[in-house]
Amino acid sequence: DEARARARRERAAKATSSSDERATRAAIEACRLRAISHLCMDFERVAGPHLGKRWCSAFEEWLASASEDEPLVPAGDGGGDALAKKLRAKKLRAKKDASDEAVDAVVRVMMLKATECARVMRNEFRGPATSVSKEERADGVVSLRVGKTEVRLNGDHFEKLKTLYANASSKEFVENDFLFDAFAMVCRYDAAAGGQFRFSGGSQASLHGQVFDVLRDCFKVECELFASPLNCRWPMYYSKYGDVDKPFGSLGDFRACKPSGGAFEANPPFDEDVVARMAEHLFECLDAASSALTFVVVTPHWPNRPCWEKMRRSKFCSRAEVISVREHGYYEGAQHRKKSRYRLATSDTSVLFLQNESAVESNPVTDEKISLLREAFRAKRDAKK
């Protein structure tokens, strides 16, 4: 009896500890979302005039350069280098002053703002959240609130998260635990999309469901390397933010994927540095594979850019297709909270098939399969720019 009582106390203590961790994570992510929202306002004011209409994309890419120790807060040296690179490239394309002085002035201000963002996050944190509330609205939107921070998502995405959460754990489903974890995860992705000042979500845009169906039926693909709990097509996926994504089944960062065989889809953020790192990892996997291995890589059509050319010219590239900007579309990056899920493409897209010799034989890329893939890529009628 004493042993059973002790075991019950230990289980209760562990459950309490786990609940505290969830409540703490939710509070931290709420602070992060508010701080990033203010940082986004500063970025538009300071860097926006130098980056033009697509400054939102540059902001997302800058946030993504942050270290894993403090996600989305690019206060370290890497953040300054990443922003300087973006500014210099934009100014050169626009034939404007790309001198070190012109770029450094913007970078200096924004790095001070990023440091302030990190400080505000630390100062606002007051310990674990005491509660999380859910409201189901008449328009089908579900809102989750912790303190003064609210996030929203469409009802179908909320139900999808429930299913992923239940499937990812062998434990009994606990509604309050789920709500804390869902709130924290949605906060992180809302912050990554620019915060609540200006939602963008370009770096999280995903393929239409019909494209995934063709990849599965024709090329045996059943796992994504760059997904999220909000946009994943299948239960098996890798994602950037393992700390908040794991409760929903994420297998971790794409670099954790080291398969001996199989078929995978890779639609990385459209950032040259990320694509270059991904390419090196995929080459290593293909070299080491002991059986048929295929990666279907979707990126912008980037001829003359080293990261793309390296994949296109690789010994593993069995086929490269280019889909015209007028002939396809995507799901919105912030589809979980937008009325229309569809968006038009903004550039030509390439689909590269990277395969080892065994995969070329057992999983061939044929004209018939490519025709089905192109049809699946077509933009939807209600797609927006």
Enumerate the predicted regions with their spans.
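Class I S-adenosyl-L-methionine
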Residues: D1-A266, F270-K385
